Amino acid sequence: EREEAPGYHSTGRSAAMFLETYGNAIIRDLTVASRLFFADPPAGFSESPLWAPRGTLTIARADQRHTLREAVTQARCHVPAIEEVDGAEARRLNPVLRSDYVAAATFDAEARELDVHAIHGGYLRGLTGRGGEVVTDAEVTALTRNAGAWTAETPVGVFTAPVVVNAA
């Protein structure tokens, strides 16, 4: 880990929503495949739930209705319950929306807010529980490959492994 603590960047980013309608087909398939893990994580992974119901609205102006309908059609492959709502219903769900701007919206009641800290902590416990170690303040200064192994040089030591993952 380059930073002084694990998760310095990853736990503070805005990827804290579970949205089966987000991204391209590959991302959506990966998201759908991970649903069971978040709904029912392995025993001991976390003492608290990994997600909570949140729901999301995606709004559209009148000139964007066609695009919104296309998005709803595509989204229903993964989230059959996604709803297209009119502007009045969108404003009922979120009263701060302007009536002169919002003509329609999608409402995804299946969207969930992820507990990033619980997820990150669960993975860290899993790593260390299996004998793994997290080394911090270890920015890679050189990376070489020799005889099927990678060698990473850092200010705190040299590490060798058959696989390197750039998780930045």
Where are these regions (language model features)?
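Short beta-to-alpha linker loops that shape the active-site pocket of alpha/beta-hydrolase fold enzymes
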Residues: E3-A5, A90, Y123
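Acidic/polar active-site rim loop that often engages polyanionic ligands
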Residues: T73, Y101-V102
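Helical element adjacent to the flavin cofactor pocket in flavoenzyme catalytic cores
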Residues: T106-V163, A167
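Glycine-rich FAD pyrophosphate-binding loop
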Residues: E1-T11
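Well-ordered beta-strand positions enriched in small/hydrophobic/aromatic, beta-favoring residues
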Residues: F18, L57, A105-T106, A152
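Dinucleotide-binding Rossmann-like beta1-alpha1 core, especially the glycine-rich loop
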Residues: A15-L93
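Short, flexible, mixed-charge acidic loops at enzyme active sites
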Residues: H9-A15, L97
